[in-house]
Amino acid sequence: MQFGIFTVGDVTTDPTTGRTPTEHERIKAILRIAIKAEEVGLDVFATGEHHNPPFVPSSPTTMLGYIAARTERLILSTSTTLITTNDPVKIAEDFAMLQHIADGRVDVMMGRGNTPPVYPWFGQDIRQGIPLAVENYALLHELWRKDVVDWQGRFRTPLQGFTSTPRPLDGVPPFVWHGSIRSPQIAEQAAYYGDGFFHNNIFWPADHTKRMVALYRERYAHYGHGEPHQAIVGLGGQVFMRKNSQDAVREFRPYFDHAPVYGGGPSLEDFTEQTPLTVGSPQQVIDRTLTFREYAGDYQRQLFLMDHAGLPLKTVLEQLDMLGEIVPVLRKEFAALRAPGVPDAPTHDSLRAAKQQSTDGTADTDDTER
């Protein structure tokens, strides 16, 4: 099972000091956090994509390319790539280039985002959000799998004899996750292609997550990709830890109370009860995270949000040290609980091996027929 972190890249005032980091400071902090993730033994770092204040990650592949040059093992991903407003040709080329730079340590999570104004900023109509996601991904899927593409759709100029460059590393496109909070159409899309489904459930109760994941698993099997338990699932989460729960709650409360993303909603106690947010001791985080399997089934990727709400870099790095200490326990416990036949999360190496096996099998069949 893969464990990692994702960032939304918010620039938020620290309510305990009144200081707001500059964009430059926040960007540099994100890079340090990503490198720290590898140092403490995590598997994945993912960044969102935003084009409006107070967020800074407007160019995920630029950021991930820098991180790739300074890490050796970490899988580099997005927690949202805006399939609705980005040109699929540019996505195809940018992430193939990143594949080559990172020696395959790349996957990508498609999503529609949660900022309605981004549509007109990029010349699109929000009322066409789902059709855009469906059509643009269909083109991207083809661009990565065909050397020469002819294409005509509703939302972009036609392509004739087009080849996106560079081609995917080893002829293997990045593994794709489809991220969704509430859109069943995106779960359907992930199932149709046999891709991964990431339910970013950080603000949602368990029963909603259960329904979304169950839908994806059911449709994954419907489209003939395998049994429901073989579908590739990822979940989000939020944690804040200290050695004892009282200190964790006391320290995190002002960040929860003042962060725009939480402000004016339920209390910290209600929010932790209703969503995956866990504020407490390391053991409480372990126990709570293990319960995710009860409503989502066996799953392959767990990403935590840890660097938000104005938390200073020093605190986030301390949190990562603590996460690095509990992840081995989570790996062991999840592995012991996992049912037979549940696959691991795909990686570039596993996808390349599967492609080679398929090629060898085809060659053997051809030889037999001759």
Language-model features, listed with the residues they occupy:
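An alpha-helical appendage that flanks or caps ligand/catalytic pockets
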Residues: 5, 130-164, 207-300, 306, ...
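N-terminal beta1-alpha1-beta2 module of alpha/beta enzyme domains
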Residues: 1-75, 342-345, 355, 369
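Short, acidic/polar
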Residues: 25-36, 94, 181-188, 285-291
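Active-site mouth loops of central-metabolism enzymes
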Residues: 14-27, 81-89, 172-182, 274-281
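Conserved, mostly hydrophobic/aromatic
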Residues: 3, 41, 49, 67, ...
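Hydrophobic faces of well-ordered beta-strands that scaffold small-molecule active sites
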Residues: 3-7, 45-47, 76-78, 106-110, ...
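Internal, glycine-rich beta/alpha segment that forms the wall or movable "lid"
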Residues: 16, 87-195, 210, 214, ...
